[in-house]
Structure formats: structure tokens, C-alpha cells
Amino acid sequence: MQLKLRWITILIVFVVSLFFMFPLDKRINLGLDLKGGMHVILGVETEKAVQAKIDTLTGQIRKELRNSKINFAFVQKNESGKISIGLSDPAERNKVKDLISKNYPILKESGLNSDEKVIELSLDTDEVKRIKDYAVEQAVQVIRNRVDQFGVNEPVIQRQGKEHILVQLAGITDPERAVKLIGKTAQLKFYLLDENANNEETIKSGNIPPDDIILYGKKIDKVTGQIVSTIPYVLKKDAVLTGDYLLEAEVRISSQFNEPYVSIKFDPAGSKIFEEITAENVNKRMAIVLDDNVYSAPVIRERIAGGEAQISGSFTLEEAKDLAIVLRAGSLPAPVKILENRTIGPSLGQDSIKKGIWAGIIGVAAVIIFMLIYYKFSGFIASIALLSNAIIILGAMGMFKATLTLPGIAGLILTMGMAIDANVLIFERIREELRLGRTPMNALEAGFEKAMSTIIDSNITTLIAGLVLFQFGTGPVKGFAVTLTIGILSSIFTAVTLSKTIFLTLYGNKEIKKLSV
């Protein structure tokens, strides 16, 4: 009965393994080094996230001082990246400080300015750290959302260190497009034009009002797709609406010009803001700005309800699709720069697969030949366990959707050797028992029983190392850890359960005088 239960267990393991193993090309995900693709390390410019927060706070403070009827000369970010508040009346200094202390606890007075009419504020050190850390975490999530919409299987997107992000996309066919998609900041903002300052004379003189900024649009030749010229726009410094309220973004084709554009829709809160802005600024121009580039600056003809707008700019269909993807996925909290960009061609990956397979075949064949010569029929049983081990490992990888890498193949070959090592321990123990004068059947039982603790101890030690590598390793190291961990568990099963079951089936009910070991 116990032997029957053993065979049922083995059969279940093999059926499940074969089910998840085939077809190999669909069940086993290949890593970057085998399938080809791109490996990119991005650096998040976290300091710009801090400066963006200061810009936002500057606008909020300016608005709050106006609402509180406090007269001020200016509220602006100075050259050192701090917020400077210029007071019209020094007597209101304490009133302003109380307002800041109450509503903006993350801001601290620098105390370096001796002018009674100027209050200089900087972000708290802990807040700066929080902003930088959040910027990287959010960037990882945004990039992951973009890649998911791009349709890449098993992408690797993870944080490295304080400000770096690792991106590995296996099987990518257009790495240049993928890099653009990943690296685009996609900060969507809406600004009102300063109609009084938006003229050639003001722009040429550079005498821009302190509450304004100049951004540029691009005039593109529709035939060649080349930039013909840039168009300056003088905009009110504070954005009236941002992409944070964006709900949908999809590509549509203009019936008038037969060109693709991106239709966007805001959530209820954004729709309300958009409606209020358009109602208050009829016959004025509003610029649609993406990553500091003005895409269009249409005149608001009437109140716009429903929260819908469109971004047009002589896009190709692919450009419009990519823009819709990055807008849906959200904007990066800070720009990213490419620190490392490597592309691995599919032919190089195929070459690695062939070499890895041949290395495995030669290694396994050499081991089987040695086992047959040295351990005779017992070596044949060990060889069956060895090949079974490979099936179980590949089946487990298919079940857990693990990714096979070149180091993973090395881990697979290593565990095959470890599986044989377990059988060698058992066989040597059986030989030792036979030399002590035990009967073949007693020597067989004693060999498996006494070798068990050594096999378990050695494999548990390696298993712990594999789990540590899996937890803290990245890329190739993690791929090696996956096959190593699965292989260790599989080798214990095949050596202890499968090999012993075969021996018991062949010799369990027989009087044997000699073991071929």
C-alpha cells in the first residue's frame, strides 16, 4: 500500500510537470539575455521634484495671501530654490508667519535674510527626503503602468539604490520607441495666456512680468514632419489645471484634417475646474502644455462642460498612441535621464540558448556515462532520476511563470549535478553497509536512511543561500536563484522518493543476493 501511494505521488508530480512544461516556447518565459530586448538604467532627477513642489507651494501661498487680504510685493522662488515673500508692510510680518506656520508646517523660515520686508522659506529636511523617495517610487509605478499598456510580457521594473530604476524588456522589437515611452515625463498643464504681454515687442525685449513665463510651441511641416520654427507664448505662471485630474486619453482621427489627435477627459473634480475656467475666460486663449512644450493655444469660445479637451500637434498615428499611453499611465513626478542603455539582439539570444542547451546535454551525458560505468545498474536508476529532475524543474518554472535566463540555465545544470550528488551519497552508503556484512535489502534500506540527514542538511544550506539571492538579487543573479531553488527541492524529491521507489519496486518482494551498485 505504501509503495502504491509512492507511485501515485510520483505520477501526480510528473503529470502536473508535463502539463505546465509543454509547449516549451509558450510555458517557459525567456529572459533578456536569451530572448533579446533592452536593458535600461534610469536616473530620477529627484531635485526637480523638490523644485516642482516649491513651485506649487509658491503659487498656493500667493493665492492664500490674496484671499487673506495681505498686501505683498512678490511671492517667488529665488535663485537658491527657496520661497521669498516680499511684504508691502513689515508690520504684517508676524501675520504672514502665523499663516505659514498654520497652513504650511513643512516650510521653515531660513533666518538668513536680514531684510524685515522679506521672509525666506525652505522645505523641511524630512519633507525633502520624503519628496525624493516618493518621486522614485511613483516613477517606478508610472513606468510599470506604461510598459503594461505597451504590451511587454514579464518586464523587470525595479528600484536600484536611492535614485535609479532598472528596466528590462525582453523580446521588445522597437527599443527606440520603448525608451521614448518610458522616459517621457508627460506633465500635462493648462495655462492662460497673458494677453497684454503676449506680443512681439514684449517677447523681444525680455521684459516679462514677474507673474508670467515664456514657453514655446513648435511649427511642424506636415509634409516632412520637420520643425520649421518655434513660437513663443507668454503665459500666466500658475497652471490653472494639470493632468492629475485626467481620467481618459484616447486617439481619434480629425474629420476635418484627417489627422490623429488625443482626446482627453477629466474626472468630475477636474471637469468642474475646467468648466469654471472656461466660463470665466471666454474669448481668452488657453495653452495646452505638455512637458513645457505648447501644443496648442486655442481661444475659449464658450463655457465647456463635460470636461473634454483635445491635444493636436501634427502627430503620426504612432506618436498619438504613445502620447495617449503616457497620459493614461500618469506623468512622472520628475524627469528621468538614461544612464545606461543596452540592446541585446534576438540572434545573440538564440546563440546563448544553443550554447546553454549544448552545455547541458554534454554535461548530463558525461554524468550519465560516469554513473553507468561506476555504479552499473544503480547508476541507470540514478540517471532516470536525473532526467526526471529536469522535467520537474521545467514544469515548476512553467507553473510559477518563472523567467529562464542564461544564469538560470547554469543554475539548472548545477542542480542536475547536485541531484546526482545525492544519489552518490546514497550509493556509497549502501556500499559501506554491504562491506559491513548486511544483506542487500538491509543495506539498501540503511543506505537511504543514513544518507538522508546528510542530503537534507547540505540541500537546506544551499536552499537558504538560493532564497537570499532571490530576495536581494537582481537580473542575472535572480534568474540563477530561481532555478537553483526549484532544482534543490526537485533533486531532494527525485533522489529520496523516486530512486528509492524504483529500488523498492524492483527488489522489495525478492530475495536478492547481490546489488548492482
Swiss-Prot record:
Subcellular localization, as worded in the UniProt entry: Cell inner membrane
SUPFAM superfamilies with a match to the protein in the record: Multidrug efflux transporter AcrB transmembrane domain
InterPro entries: Acrflvin-R (IPR001036), SecD (IPR005791), SecD/SecF_arch_bac (IPR022813), SecD_1st (IPR048631), SecD_SecF_C (IPR048634), SecD_SecF_C_bact (IPR055344), SecDF_P1_head (IPR054384)
Residue pairs linked by disulfide bridges in the UniProt entry: none
Any one GO cellular component localisation term in the record: plasma membrane
Keywords, in A-Z order: Cell inner membrane, Cell membrane, Membrane, Protein transport, Translocation, Transmembrane, Transmembrane helix, Transport
GO biological process: intracellular protein transmembrane transport; protein targeting; protein transport by the Sec complex
Family named by the database record: Belongs to the SecD/SecF family. SecD subfamily.
Subunit structure: Forms a complex with SecF. Part of the essential Sec protein translocation apparatus which comprises SecA, SecYEG and auxiliary proteins SecDF. Other proteins may also be involved.
Role played: Part of the Sec protein translocase complex. Interacts with the SecYEG preprotein conducting channel. SecDF uses the proton motive force (PMF) to complete protein translocation after the ATP-dependent function of SecA.
Protein name, UniProt field: Protein translocase subunit SecD
Native source organism of the sequence: Calditerrivibrio nitroreducens (strain DSM 19672 / NBRC 101217 / Yu37-1)
